[in-house]
UniProtKB/Swiss-Prot annotation:
Reactions catalysed according to its record: UDP-N-acetyl-alpha-D-muramate + NADP(+) = UDP-N-acetyl-3-O-(1-carboxyvinyl)-alpha-D-glucosamine + NADPH + H(+)
Any one GO BP annotation for this protein: peptidoglycan biosynthetic process
Family statement drawn from the similarity comment of this UniProt entry: Belongs to the MurB family.
Keyword annotations of the record: Cell cycle, Cell division, Cell shape, Cell wall biogenesis/degradation, Cytoplasm, FAD, Flavoprotein, NADP, Oxidoreductase, Peptidoglycan synthesis
The protein, known as: UDP-N-acetylenolpyruvoylglucosamine reductase
Its job: Cell wall formation.
Protein's pathway: Cell wall biogenesis; peptidoglycan biosynthesis
Molecular function via GO: FAD binding; UDP-N-acetylmuramate dehydrogenase activity
Pfam families to which the protein is assigned, alphabetical: FAD_binding_4, MurB_C
Active site: 175, 224 (proton donor), 297
Cofactor(s) annotated in UniProt: FAD
InterPro entries the UniProt entry points to: FAD-bd_PCMH, FAD-bd_PCMH-like_sf, FAD-bd_PCMH_sub1, FAD-bd_PCMH_sub2, MurB, MurB_C, MurB_C_sf, Oxid_FAD_bind_N
């Protein structure tokens, strides 16, 4: 890695670049070591310049809210990019179209839609991530996904080229899409429908009640660990885990939630190795018991 080149570049832009940056507080598991470079672009020109200069040279990982990421305790030999506050702007256009930056929290978009009397975004109140992360994995809950309200995506590639992708050109599947892995999402436009604010608010409250009843809250967890294996069985992944794994199993401080067994929890000071061992133990146990191979929903940064 050309650290000296990046240090020199950091003096040429207004955005902040940190070196040997601790990532532990940047994810919901509260697990992880350092990254050699941590770039938080405050504006698009700085991001374009960085990618044109280093996009092909460096290993790059985009970090959103960290609500779906497990980070290694070893130092990441690359660049972690976390888009700054100017990428979290949100605005409304005619015909009930909303544009949101990819660093915008899902809940912020849901609240904005509610305040403007636009329905269709209620489910986002229950997803604890950013717009960019939601687009990346076609996040969803309660039978609704990002693709259902998406109009278009603005993205940038590792060469610093910015372009717009209509939703109609993207093949979305369960928790995935066919877009190139190295794309960085900048913003997206979404379309909802006019709806009574009280109706929207009631639906949001109802969805939150369902979520809080079924899922752990205010704990160090990254949500669903594995995807539902929809191409192998109709059974939900939590049911497969419950039937295949002793739920009191733990590795260090890495435990299975007693509220939802597809949620793994750092009870105190679990290491990456602890959590990764738990994930692999569950994966192997389910395969041995059922023959079904689980795929991780959480992202691993190492």
């Amino acid at each position: 890695m050309s650290i000296e080149e990046i240090r020199k570049f950091s003096n040429e832009i207004s955005s902040k670049i940190n070196f040997d940056y601790d990532l532990k507080k940047s994810n919901w598991f509260n697990i992880g070591g350092q990254t050699k470079v941590y770039f938080r672009p405050d504006n698009l020109p700085d991001l374009i310049l960085f990618l044109k200069k280093f996009g092909e040279k460096e290993k790059i990982h985009i970090l959103g809210a960290g609500s779906n990421t497990l980070i290694s305790d070893e130092k990441f030999d690359g660049v972690v990019i976390k888009l700054g506050k100017n990428f979290s702007n949100i605005s409304i256009l005619p015909n009930d179209v909303i544009i949101a930056g990819s660093a915008c929290l899902d809940k912020k978009l849901s609240d904005f839609a509610l305040n403007n009397g636009i329905g269709g975004f209620e489910f986002l109140a229950c997803i604890p991530g950013t717009i960019g992360g939601g687009l990346k994995m076609n996040a969803g809950c309660f039978n609704k996904e990002f693709k259902d309200v998406l109009v278009s995506i603005q993205a940038i590639d590792k060469n610093g080229q910015v372009f717009t992708i209509p939703a109609s050109k993207v093949i979305f599947k369960y928790r995935s899409n066919d877009l190139k892995e190295d794309l960085i999402f900048l913003s997206a436009s979404f379309k909802g429908t006019k709806k009574n604010k009280e109706e929207i608010e009631n639906e949001v409250l109802e969805l939150k009640k369902k979520k809080d009843k079924a899922q752990p809250t205010k704990l160090k967890t990254s949500g669903s660990t594995f995807k539902n294996p929809i191409d192998q069985t109709d059974k939900k992944v939590w049911k497969l885990i419950k039937d295949s794994v002793p739920l009191d199993i733990s590795f260090g401080d890495a435990h299975i939630s007693n509220k939802h067994c597809n949620f793994f929890v750092n009870k105190n000071n679990a290491s990456f190795e602890d959590m990764n061992k738990l994930i692999e133990f569950v994966k192997i146990s389910v395969e041995k018991k059922t023959g079904i191979v689980l795929e991780k929903e959480i992202k691993i940064l190492k």
